[in-house]
């Protein structure tokens, strides 16, 4: 008698979530650098309105905001307007305890490029920051 294979769907979903961590960070960096949270301080706006204020491409910004809305960073209403959530408040520049500046720092090449070379770092036993 053979036993049924274990159900790995939950583990697969959790691991996939971790796999997409870089995407989440890149989206947070993008909206932080553009000042989206500051532009939403006065109330909800569409991605097109935010694109006009930030200089970003509207359809691409809309995709980023929708992704972040699935993570409860922003809220999207029935009119496709985006609003701040308590989490997004921490991306504003004028919020006490803001994470605005740390997100900007972590999104810069100084940090991203060495992370992309982590395999070589571990294989060679030296830091990628030297490259």
Segments predicted by a language model, with ranges:
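Conserved Class I S-adenosyl-L-methionine-dependent methyltransferase catalytic core
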Residues: 2-55, 59-131
């Amino acid at each position: 008698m053979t036993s049924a294979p274990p159900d790995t769907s939950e583990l697969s979903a959790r691991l996939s979530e971790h796999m997409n961590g870089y995407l989440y960070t890149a989206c947070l960096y993008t909206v932080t650098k553009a000042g989206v949270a500051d532009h939403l301080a006065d109330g909800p706006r569409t991605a097109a309105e935010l694109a006009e204020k930030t200089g970003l491409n509207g359809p691409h910004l809309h995709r980023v905001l929708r992704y972040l809305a699935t993570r409860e960073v922003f809220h999207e209403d029935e009119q496709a307007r985006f609003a701040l959530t308590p989490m997004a408040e921490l991306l504003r520049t004028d919020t006490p305890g803001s994470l605005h500046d740390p997100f900007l720092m972590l999104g810069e090449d100084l940090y991203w490029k060495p992370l992309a070379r982590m395999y070589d770092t571990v294989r060679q036993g030296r830091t990628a920051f030297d490259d």
